[in-house]
């Protein structure tokens, strides 16, 4: 049985092309993926992300629980509302999921996890919560709308109440605040400014319509994917999964090895990988000639000593902002500034870059 979000009627009303996304019927576009992409890079667009899973954690030992569960350290969160991005790892150091954690009070944290991993995430979290007497509450009655782009905050301000505007004034990135019936967070998956707004289901359609009336363009999963790829943001199950180390997925910055006494799940495996120094790494690829880089394509190169090496593209697409093809790839660490990708039985030279291409409207390559 395919699931739908509370905003499903609004998508049909807007003429969306609907697709099955991990068991959810979601909009892939509303006519033009390209126009939706550019709307977010140059103005303001909105996405229905109500399929994401919101999980509230409460208990006296909830901080200690999250310090055990997550590879990043929630002890960094000292101001209520502050959030961090982290991997949730298995004992082998593979990524069960990547998620955002909000610190709300000393006994209350909120997680936002991926929809495709919902069941295994909840089972894993609940299993480990038992030892810490932490209560795990899924919040399916909440919907979520992401409003993204250089003009997103200004347009959202027209929809917020004066109290909500006061609550978000001057709020830095990666913060969330409960303001009236909305939980408003300065997070996103596009590389642009904006909010992710958690709203009670019964008020979601009105909020969507109000944003629409104020010139925010509805955007589908197609544009969401090209935007996050340009920003160099991982997509779970493509760029990392339970068999992939965060060290091989450009997530080393999310690993908190200090203090040494914090024994988070997967720590020993990661320390062994670091000591071995043989872990693959994630890079960006740029191909300015015609053709499109796609996930699964092999990436080959020759080292300075003449040895042949091979990696693989994990995410690839035409970049609407740059006007040529880009990709994220997992490759041996000794890759140089160029590599080759086989496209239609022809080897094409690609430039190797850092794994981020566009942020805040600025081209990085």
Curated annotation (Swiss-Prot):
Keywords, ordered alphabetically: Aminotransferase, Transferase
Pfam families per the UniProt record, alphabetical: GCV_T, GCV_T_C
BP GO annotations: glycine decarboxylation via glycine cleavage system
Catalytic activities: N(6)-[(R)-S(8)-aminomethyldihydrolipoyl]-L-lysyl-[protein] + (6S)-5,6,7,8-tetrahydrofolate = N(6)-[(R)-dihydrolipoyl]-L-lysyl-[protein] + (6R)-5,10-methylene-5,6,7,8-tetrahydrofolate + NH4(+)
SUPFAM superfamilies associated with the record: Aminomethyltransferase beta-barrel domain (SSF101790), Folate-binding domain (SSF103025)
Molecular function GO terms recorded: aminomethyltransferase activity; transaminase activity
GO cellular component, one term: cytosol
EC number: 2.1.2.10
Function recorded in the entry: The glycine cleavage system catalyzes the degradation of glycine.
Subunit structure: The glycine cleavage system is composed of four proteins: P, T, L and H.
Record-stated family: Belongs to the GcvT family.
HAMAP family in UniProt: GcvT
Name this protein carries in UniProt: Aminomethyltransferase
Organism: Aeromonas salmonicida (strain A449)
